[in-house]
Amino acid sequence: MEQDRASDVPPAKKRRRPTVVCTNCKRRKSKCDRLKPVCGNCLRLGDETTCAYGLEPAGEARKPGVSRLVAQCFEMVRSTQPTLIDLQPNGVLIQCKRSCTSYIAPLTPSAAKQRDPYLQALGLVCQLKRTMRAADPAPKKEGTAEATSRGSLPNSMRYIESIEQNSPEQPASLASRHKNMCRQLFTKFGKYRRNHTSSTEDDLKALPSRVPAKKVFFRHIWPYFWSHLSGLCPIFDEAQLEKSLKRVYDRFSPDTHSKLDVEDYACFSIVLLITCLVQLSLKFAQDYTEENTNSESSIVMGIDTSKFISMVNGCISRKKGDRKCSLLRLQSLLLLRFYYWCAPDDGDGDYLQHSNMLMGKIVAACYSMGIEWQCVRDPEEFVNNFNLCLGLMPLEAEYDASDYKKIWTTVLHWDRKLSLLTGQRCLIGNSIKLPTPGHESPSCALLKFDSLILKICDMISNDPRRVDATAVIRLLETLRQSLKKDTRENIVNPALGFEWGMVIALLELTITHAHMVHSEKTESPDEFCDCIQGLFEKVLQITKICEQYLYSQEGLDPSARFYTNKIVDIAFSSISAIFPSLILRSGRSIEPHTKTTLLNFYRDILSASFNTIGVEYYSCFRRMFPSKLVFRTLSAAGDEDPWTRILEFIVSSDYNKEFALLQRSGIFKQFFKSYEKTGNVESAASLWSAYYAPNDLYSFDLDVKSFGLQMPFSHSNRYNDYDVFEAFFNNAKTLFLAKVPNLPALNGTALGQGAFNYFDYSLLQGIENFDSADFLDFFEPGGSEALVELESQESPSNHDIC
């Protein structure tokens, strides 16, 4: 009877839930921190691919005699669900110009503008009309050096000179100060262009006499470089490099006329580059050092380095430079790549793409010389093989594997950094896991993180259409904590640690913005609220760092600011491109005055950027003009919703012709079809809300009122006397700015007036063939992200321009 009753009771169901600890930690019987998608133990031990939190199949009990190890081989392992986002929803973007064709990598600011439908529409609305005109003959190269520099600017820029020459003298007022600023900036940036296109054949023939004198170099330049700058680009052995440079100086003394060989060109290139770098360091450190400029600094700053980079490029191409390479030539290539990153002229281009070919040459040279992971993995064996291949005794060899190891570490640093900033595939596609001991020297400290960094890069570049945002953010946080620890312990150079921290923050900013756009397209309101709040907080974090960097006298070594200025410039570029997405969505905010607060914050960011970085760096300065158009477009109607005005303008235009690019987006294509059924301009905003992102579901609250007191740059009165951002480009008008007072949402409201709206530019009127669009083209090549050129049958309107 008892046996029958027991048989009637159903068997107990096995509880099915994910394991609390990961399967690896459970097998190792180690404490698991339970982090997902990869726990700390698996990340440290290199078991990222097998770290999972599995489910044990229900109703499948292990039979007697079957070992747990064998049973575990057949268990179903189910990892956490990934959060896949699309970084290229509109496809692969290619920009074609006369000079080059560029791939718009998925993490660049330009890609963010094309990924977000709000920013995509804003960019098209902010475009100036493009017209064609014949080029005027260049002015004769006579007169002062200042006039010659301005003559190196494009044709449309030469009319700025007529303002300076023909304007009557004015007292020391705001207008005269603005005119002087125009003269200084255009002369300086014109000089950059002239130096890059100047002929250097005669200079190369007399190269030994063009470099700094031996006494000046080794007394004033060399000590500064080695004590302050060598740690930023650790590719040299001090004793060996000094020996090589002194030897080439002695060979080419004024009394000798030897013929230059491969190593001579490489040594002179290094001398020229070191001189340029020391001069840049001294220039940007002046405002952050209490000491007055001493005589040694004056000597270095007095050296004319205007043709040095052109001479370096000429040296590198000599003696079969594309077919053969030596260690010194490779080091000169790396130093040139370092200079392009730091230089205030063209630098790496709008998309950080101008040095890609140089990096490819550097990586190929490394492989041809045997500089790769083997010199890190087996340094002792590598040294023996290296010396024997030279046919020298070990004591006679000038270099050893430590030089190769430092070079390989530096190449990896540049390759991984550019991949994280742009989303392009790494040129070096493999890595190895290294034990921590033995790799803690400052020059090789980043090697132990390379495997993790490469994994992050591959998660983005392998398939930008399917990126696991959760996994990327998780791995970035692990990388941040590891770098933070090493930076505090001075294992990593502080300037490099600061740079990597900014790189991680900027990648998080881009991923968060892409996730926000993805949540709207996939109709996930909860994810959207989390993402837009996280995006705003990330902007606050980065701008706070930039504020402390620009205005604080403490922190980084002033001599390294010429290097770290670049990553701050990239940060400003990314924020100025992404932040308008918050302003355009401010109409959904349930908090009053959100748009006004965000717009004021945006103005403060732009003002700080262009008054500090913009007056020194050519790439930043030319971004000011499209940024000014964006700011004027967003602030065109006071407290009204800017997105409503943009939609009304688009649908009231011939959007099939003037906004043809939007037709490629499925979102706008269906929006236009729906609008054609109603035909009511005033209903455009409500139609968009009903179709794409309903205001009731996608409303948000950023709590800007409490954040307002903490927003960076908000309490700065540094530019009350003269603000470069406020002064320039006030009178140029797009079709939107000309039409905006007549849109239904504004009811004829006039645009606001600023102090510089009254600046006299009447001298520009009446000049034959003058076109303001060419002025903008100079500073933003290809116009406002000219992935497609808008056609226009109308005659170009006259625009006032500053």
From Swiss-Prot:
SMART domains: GAL4 (SM00066). Residues 22-51 bind DNA. The keyword Metal-binding applies. Belongs to the OAF3 family. Transcriptional inhibitor with a significantly increased number of target genes in response to oleate. It is found in: Cytoplasm; Nucleus; Mitochondrion. It comes from the Eukaryota. GO terms for molecular function: DNA-binding transcription factor activity, RNA polymerase II-specific; RNA polymerase II cis-regulatory region sequence-specific DNA binding; zinc ion binding. This is Oleate activated transcription factor 3. One of its GO terms (cellular component) is nucleus. Keywords: Cytoplasm, DNA-binding, Metal-binding, Mitochondrion, Nucleus, Repressor, Transcription, Transcription regulation, Zinc. The lineage of its organism: Eukaryota, Fungi, Dikarya, Ascomycota, Saccharomycotina. GO terms for biological process: DNA-templated transcription; positive regulation of transcription by RNA polymerase II. Its main location: cytoplasm. SUPFAM superfamilies: Zn2/Cys6 DNA-binding domain. Gene3D superfamilies: Zn(2)-C6 fungal-type DNA-binding domain. Disulfide bonds: none annotated.
